[in-house]
Design a protein with these regions (language model features):
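Catalytic-core region of right-hand nucleic acid polymerases
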Residues: 5-157, 269, 277, 281-328, ...
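RNase H catalytic domain
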Residues: 206, 492-564
Length: 636
């Protein structure tokens, strides 16, 4: 608190003055302590001791506040790196970031409302003079400052005179060594979205709350740093320790290295390999966390499961295929959540409150009571100590993730920036499925067709009569599953194609865009299946193909009436009722005669059909062969 007072973030008064402050509220204070970071005071503006109470956050609204846009920051930062590489294909690109000290505190409260944010610690009453960490409007209120800074810094970034002005700061920054003649720079390519840097003398800045992220070539980087510092001082005031704290956090300038490889927002970026990955510190931390989930462990609490899932989701931000590794863990945590909610609601005090709530339905006080009760149930749910048990499938998943994190050289944990940013795809495929067969193609390159085995046809809705509550419904092979198989086969075909013909793409990490007319199968490319066991099994197969694969994958939806050729290919099957034949197909689409046909390997098909029939997890066992192209065209 002495530090807060020294920085003039608050006004300390004798605690007896609290009796004269009309709008004083009970607001708990907390302290967030993280190793390697400064401790942060937290102001809990959502606390209410009972349902009649009104907390400060209930009096505030974000509807009239500036829109928060920092969620897009990291993607924009990656795109700026991509454009820099287009313009500077063989020049080192350096990364840096600086932040604002006491960011939210720079937004000052009006004197008429400042007292409402007061709190008492020991024998002193503290009145915050600026935004608090815990108010729902603090992030929104800082947005104008953040946006003003990046625009002003961009405007100033072509000025060379600023470097001398801040030489005393920038000279203390350590820079990585220059690349030697053997250094390889992974390339980026122009497209309709990214055309390179328009003004090479200017720098693009992206703010994530109070962190300003930027990238630039080595010769320009010092000027970019100077412009960032100048913009901050113009907006928040130049250093004057007798009046206020220096708004610039100098830790980044004095204690970190400006390099081609840097940890930004918790993710390791590398501009030479044009990739992002889990940091080594985080990898070891996750291994330490997973070591407590050893094979002899039998159970876990809801909070323990949620914390683990949170760590894995963070990992998935840098390796998208990770989301397909812990289906059972996610299901077990969700089941534990439902169980803990039920246990909490069955407590006597909660039941009593719920009865009172039902009796006051329609009254003005009902909404306040309901909000208070829901908050209490949610809070107590995560404190519930009811045990959830680790089954065999979950144990296998934990073992699998430990194995992957323990062998980073065998399992590539890097993801190319080319697979993350929004850009024009290098390959485009179309696919479709019916209950009899599936097919797909990439225009002017290849096509493929597979008729489903009779065992699978027998389990489709066409031949299996089920209802939602029927046990037989678990055996059902839905059209969603068949459409997802088509997407996997399209991905396998492009993987084989690029491996055999790497010159088809202008860079090392192509992106496949697969068009599908099924929304569920589209979502399964980036989101884990929640309910269907067979969908989870298929996602595990896709995961095994994606690991160490230079080809990226994304899916988009196309209207069924526009997906004509893929639909016709999938409608060809052996049946007296089928009106379509390959002969008719080639007559209607003569261009297909010059395309190669892709044949999925029997090993890959066996994996996929096993997933459709049994839903059993195959583990991470990627097929040794995905398939081949028949160069003898027109052979069916």
């Amino acid at each position: 608190m002495n530090k807060e007072d020294k920085n003039q973030y608050l006004l300390p008064l004798p605690c007896w003055m609290a009796r004269f402050i009309k709008n004083l509220h009970v607001t708990p204070q907390g302290l967030v302590i993280k190793p390697g970071k400064n401790d942060r005071l937290i102001w809990d503006g959502s606390f209410i001791p009972n349902w009649q109470a009104t907390c400060i956050n209930m009096m505030l609204s974000t509807d009239t506040e500036p829109e928060i846009i920092y969620g897009e920051t990291f993607m924009k930062h990656l795109e700026s790196i991509w454009n820099l590489r287009i313009t500077h294909p063989v020049t080192d690109i350096l990364l840096f970031d600086d932040d604002v000290k006491g960011a939210f505190r720079h937004n000052k409260y009006h004197p008429d409302i400042a007292a409402a944010f007061s709190f008492i610690i020991a024998n002193l009453l503290y009145i915050p003079l600026g935004g608090t960490f815990g108010s729902i409007t603090s992030p929104s209120n800082f947005e104008p400052i953040a946006r003003a800074r990046i625009h002003l810094a961009n405007f100033l970034s072509n000025r060379t005179d600023l470097l001398q002005k801040y030489k005393h700061i920038i000279d203390k920054v350590k820079f990585s060594e220059e690349p030697d003649s053997n250094t390889v720079f992974v390339q980026a390519v122009k497209d309709s979205i990214h055309k390179g840097v328009q003004d090479t003398k200017k720098t693009i800045y992206n703010m994530f709350v109070d962190d300003s992220l930027f990238a630039q070539i080595r010769s320009v980087m010092p000027h970019s740093m100077a412009a960032s510092i100048e913009a901050l001082y113009i907006i928040l005031g130049f250093p004057d320790v007798q009046i206020r704290q220096d708004p610039l956090s100098l830790d980044k300038y004095f204690e970190s290295i400006c390099s081609f490889q840097r940890i930004q927002l918790g993710i390791s970026l590398n501009t030479r390999t044009m990739s992002l990955r889990l940091t080594e510190k985080k990898r070891l931390s996750m291994l330490e966390e997973l070591s407590h989930w050893h094979k002899k462990r039998k159970s876990f609490t809801l909070l323990q499961g949620v914390i683990l899932c949170g760590s894995l989701e963070f990992w998935a931000n840098s390796s998208p295929w990770v989301r397909f590794l812990y289906h059972q863990l996610r299901s077990s945590v969700n089941l534990s959540l439902c169980n803990c909610v039920q246990i909490t609601k069955n407590r006597k005090d909660i039941k009593k409150s719920m009865t009172e709530l039902a009796n006051t339905k329609g009254l003005e006080s009902n909404e306040l009571k309901q909000r208070f009760l829901l908050k209490k149930v949610a809070k107590d749910t995560y404190k519930c100590q009811a045990k959830a048990y680790i089954n065999k499938s979950m144990g296998n998943e934990l073992k699998m993730m430990i194995n992957i994190l323990s062998h980073p050289k065998h399992f590539n944990l890097e993801t190319p920036i080319a697979h993350v940013i929004t850009r024009d795809p290098d390959f485009i495929t179309y696919g479709d499925a019916c209950l009899e067969a599936g097919g797909g193609y990439s225009e002017n390159i290849f096509w493929w067709h597979e008729e489903w085995p009779e065992a699978i046809k027998a389990l489709t809705i066409k031949n299996l009569t089920v209802s939602r509550k029927c046990k037989e419904s678990n055996k059902l092979v839905s059209i969603n599953l068949l459409e997802f198989v088509v997407e996997i086969l399209n991905y396998a075909a492009i993987t084989v194609l690029f491996k055999e013909n790497p010159t088809l793409c202008a860079h090392s990490f192509p992106l496949l865009l697969n068009w599908t007319d099924n929304m569920t199968s589209k979502s399964w490319i980036r989101k884990a299946a929640k309910k269907t066991k067979k969908g989870k099994a298929l996602q595990r197969i896709l995961c095994s193909i994606m690991i160490n694969n230079p080809v990226g994958l994304k899916a988009e939806h196309i209207a069924g009436k526009k997906n004509i050729l893929a639909d016709l290919i999938s409608r060809i099957y052996k049946s007296p009722h089928s009106k379509f034949t390959f002969k008719n197909l080639f007559q209607d689409f003569p261009q297909m005669k010059s395309w190669n046909r892709f044949h999925p390997s029997q090993e890959l098909l066996s994996f996929l059909y096993s997933g459709l029939l049994t839903g059993q997890d195959q583990g991470l066992c990627p097929p040794k062969h995905l398939g081949y192209f028949d160069l003898h065209r027109n052979i069916l």
